[in-house]
Regions:
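Catalytic strand-loop segment that frames the active site of acyl-thioester-processing enzymes
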Residues: 1-38
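HotDog/MaoC-like acyl-thioester-processing domains
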Residues: 3-7, 70-71, 82-144
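Hydrophobic residues in beta-strands and at strand termini
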Residues: 9-13, 65, 113
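A broad, structural micro-motif
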Residues: 22, 56-58, 104
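Short, electropositive, low-hydrophobicity segments enriched in small/polar residues
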Residues: 24, 47, 122
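Residue-level recognition of specific faces of alpha-helices
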Residues: 27-30, 57, 92
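Hydrophobic beta-strand-centered segment that forms part of the acyl-chain substrate-binding groove
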Residues: 38-89
Length: 144
């Protein structure tokens, strides 16, 4: 099993701008939407992790807009955790049109793990079971 997730999204009218295309800020929201799905699919849902004292804020995000999505388009949003160190992780995203396969946007986000008090957490030290799960999914036999 890889650390990947996917979801579909029907573009809503309120997500478009005056030109009738999806406003660029919505892609970042869609990244969060699929990232939440990804963590649920690998058994590490955000809600449960936060209840257990692990928060994973975004520390950087980028998006490259390729083509325009419009109202009523269905897009597929894919995410993959591409790097995990025990303290940080990086996610890569691709948004494409469901009907045509045309890529609409590609992006990345970087995250760390913190306590509810805002202190950096090493999952390897503080949550070894969660660390093992993520390490195996992302790094396989390589040690984080």
């Amino acid at each position: 099993m890889a650390a990947t997730g996917e979801c579909e999204h029907l573009v809503q009218y309120y997500e478009t701008d005056q030109m009738g295309v999806v406003h660029h800020s919505n892609y970042i929201r869609w990244f969060e939407e699929v990232r939440t799905v990804l963590f649920e699919e690998i058994g590490l849902g955000y809600k449960g992790m936060e209840e257990g004292g692990i928060i994973s804020p975004v520390v950087a995000v980028s998006a490259k807009y390729k083509t325009m999505a419009k109202y009523c388009d269905t897009v597929v949003i894919r995410a993959e955790i591409v790097k995990y160190t025990g303290v940080r992780f990086d996610v890569r995203y691709k948004v494409f049109d469901k009907a045509t396969g045309e890529v609409r946007c590609e992006g990345t986000s970087e995250h760390c793990f913190i306590s509810p008090e805002g202190k950096i957490i090493s999952l390897k030290r503080s949550y070894p079971e969660i660390h093992s799960r993520l390490d195996q999914l992302v790094n396989g036999d390589r040690e984080a």
